C-alpha cells in the first residue's frame, strides 16, 4: 500500500468513527429529552403515588437539620397546610402521666457540641412539638461556659430544636435575642417573644414567623419579664402575661392579646395582694388559664383566668397540698396567699378539672429536688390536704428545677379534646454543684393519658465534674 492509499484509508476510518460518534450523541440527546418529558408529565398526576421516598445514607442535611442515619427510608412531602388552632376544646380526661420526651443534653454534652441552656419549655403547632430554650452563647465543656449561672446577659438567646433532641448548633433554630421568653403557634405561624436589655430598660421583641412585628418597652423599669413557657393561642389570637416590678413585693402584671404578632389589646391586673411571675398558661374551652409563681409571699400558687376579651378572674389554689418551693409541710390551705415559707419560689404549673386539680411540684419542700404529680379531687376550692393520686417522675435525690405546662391541640393529636402535658427542667451545675464552673439543664416531658401509668425516676444522670471543671 503506497503512502497515498494509507492516507485515504486512515481518513476513511476517522470519518466512519466520527459519524458513529455523532449518531450516538444525537441518540443520547433524544433519550434525555424523552426521559425528561416523562418525569415532567408524571408530576402532574395526583394520588397516593406522589409521596417521594428518599433514601438517606450516612450523614446529610434535611431541612437545615443534621441527620446521622444509614439506609433509612423517609417519606417526604408532609402536609403543611395552615389552619387556625381553635382552642375551644376542654382538657382530655386523664388518670396519669406518660413519659413523652427526655433529651439527656448534659450527658451528651460531656463529649458533644451541646448548648449551655436554662429555662427550656415546649410548645406544639398542629404539625410538631419543639423544645425552646435560652442559651448562654456557649457550649458545655468549653471555657465560655464559665459563669453561666448568671440569668441576664447580652449573650443569651431564645432558640428551638425538635423535641427530645439535645440542643446543639446542628439542630437548633435561632428565634430571638432574649434572657426571658415565650413562644406559641396559632396554626399559621410561630409567635416568639424575647426580652433583652438592661434591668432598668429591657425591651420585649415580638416576632411572627421570624419577622419583628411589635416592641414592648419596660413600663416600670424593674426587669420586664415573661412566662418562660408557651403562650396560648385561641381562634387566631395569642395571649401572654408579662411582669414588671419587684420580685419581693407588689408589681405590675399585664395581659396582652396578639394577632399575627401585633398587639390588639392589653390590660393591667388589679391584684394588689397577689404576685404573678413566670405563668404557665393553657387553653380550656375557649378561655385561658394561667397558674403562676408568687415570689413575694405565697407558698401556694396564684392563678388568673380570662376570656378572649381579657375579662379576668384571679385567685390562689386553695389546696393544702402546696405547689411552690420553698413551702411548709402539707396541711391547712387557703384561697389567699399562704404566707408560711412564702418568700421566693420556682416556676411551676397546675391543671384545673372543675373543683379538682393536678398539682406538679418538687418532692423536696426546701430545695429544687425531685418531682411529683398529685391529683387533689377538691383542691381547687377546698383547703384540706387530702389527695387521691401521687405519681413520682424524679426521685428526691435527683435535681429538678422549673416546670411548666403545654398542650397538644386536637388538630395535632386527632383527639376531640385538649391533651395536657408538662415539662420539667433538670438543672445541673452551680450554684448547688460547686465542682463545676457552669450552670445548665436537660429536660423531660410527660403527657396526660386516660390509663394506668408508672412511678419511676427519670433524672438528668450526668456524671460531674466535666473536663473543663478540673
Swiss-Prot record:
<feature type="disulfide bond">
    <location>
        <begin position="318"/>
        <end position="335"/>
    </location>
</feature>
<feature type="disulfide bond">
    <location>
        <begin position="281"/>
        <end position="290"/>
    </location>
</feature>
<keyword id="KW-0325">Glycoprotein</keyword>
<feature type="disulfide bond">
    <location>
        <begin position="124"/>
        <end position="129"/>
    </location>
</feature>
<feature type="glycosylation site" description="N-linked (GlcNAc...) asparagine; by host">
    <location>
        <position position="58"/>
    </location>
</feature>
<feature type="glycosylation site" description="N-linked (GlcNAc...) asparagine; by host">
    <location>
        <position position="68"/>
    </location>
</feature>
<keyword id="KW-1032">Host cell membrane</keyword>
<feature type="binding site">
    <location>
        <position position="294"/>
    </location>
    <ligand>
        <name>Ca(2+)</name>
    </ligand>
</feature>
<feature type="disulfide bond">
    <location>
        <begin position="92"/>
        <end position="417"/>
    </location>
</feature>
<dbReference type="GO" id="GO:0005975">
    <property type="term" value="P:carbohydrate metabolic process"/>
</dbReference>
<keyword id="KW-1043">Host membrane</keyword>
<feature type="binding site">
    <location>
        <position position="152"/>
    </location>
    <ligand>
        <name>substrate</name>
    </ligand>
</feature>
<keyword id="KW-1015">Disulfide bond</keyword>
<keyword id="KW-0378">Hydrolase</keyword>
<dbReference type="Pfam" id="PF00064">
    <property type="entry name" value="Neur"/>
</dbReference>
<feature type="region of interest" description="Hypervariable stalk region">
    <location>
        <begin position="36"/>
        <end position="90"/>
    </location>
</feature>
<feature type="disulfide bond">
    <location>
        <begin position="233"/>
        <end position="238"/>
    </location>
</feature>
<keyword id="KW-0326">Glycosidase</keyword>
<dbReference type="InterPro" id="IPR001860">
    <property type="entry name" value="Glyco_hydro_34"/>
</dbReference>
<keyword id="KW-0106">Calcium</keyword>
<keyword id="KW-0946">Virion</keyword>
<feature type="disulfide bond">
    <location>
        <begin position="279"/>
        <end position="292"/>
    </location>
</feature>
<feature type="glycosylation site" description="N-linked (GlcNAc...) asparagine; by host">
    <location>
        <position position="63"/>
    </location>
</feature>
<feature type="region of interest" description="Involved in apical transport and lipid raft association">
    <location>
        <begin position="11"/>
        <end position="33"/>
    </location>
</feature>
<dbReference type="InterPro" id="IPR033654">
    <property type="entry name" value="Sialidase_Influenza_A/B"/>
</dbReference>
<dbReference type="InterPro" id="IPR036278">
    <property type="entry name" value="Sialidase_sf"/>
</dbReference>
<feature type="topological domain" description="Intravirion">
    <location>
        <begin position="1"/>
        <end position="6"/>
    </location>
</feature>
<keyword id="KW-1133">Transmembrane helix</keyword>
<feature type="topological domain" description="Virion surface">
    <location>
        <begin position="28"/>
        <end position="470"/>
    </location>
</feature>
<comment type="subunit">
    <text>Homotetramer.</text>
</comment>
<dbReference type="GO" id="GO:0004308">
    <property type="term" value="F:exo-alpha-sialidase activity"/>
</dbReference>
<feature type="glycosylation site" description="N-linked (GlcNAc...) asparagine; by host">
    <location>
        <position position="455"/>
    </location>
</feature>
<feature type="region of interest" description="Head of neuraminidase">
    <location>
        <begin position="91"/>
        <end position="470"/>
    </location>
</feature>
<feature type="disulfide bond">
    <location>
        <begin position="421"/>
        <end position="447"/>
    </location>
</feature>
<feature type="glycosylation site" description="N-linked (GlcNAc...) asparagine; by host">
    <location>
        <position position="365"/>
    </location>
</feature>
<protein>
    <recommendedName>
        <fullName>Neuraminidase</fullName>
        <ecNumber>3.2.1.18</ecNumber>
    </recommendedName>
</protein>
<feature type="binding site">
    <location>
        <begin position="277"/>
        <end position="278"/>
    </location>
    <ligand>
        <name>substrate</name>
    </ligand>
</feature>
<feature type="transmembrane region" description="Helical">
    <location>
        <begin position="7"/>
        <end position="27"/>
    </location>
</feature>
<feature type="glycosylation site" description="N-linked (GlcNAc...) asparagine; by host">
    <location>
        <position position="146"/>
    </location>
</feature>
<feature type="glycosylation site" description="N-linked (GlcNAc...) asparagine; by host">
    <location>
        <position position="235"/>
    </location>
</feature>
<feature type="binding site">
    <location>
        <position position="324"/>
    </location>
    <ligand>
        <name>Ca(2+)</name>
    </ligand>
</feature>
<dbReference type="GO" id="GO:0020002">
    <property type="term" value="C:host cell plasma membrane"/>
</dbReference>
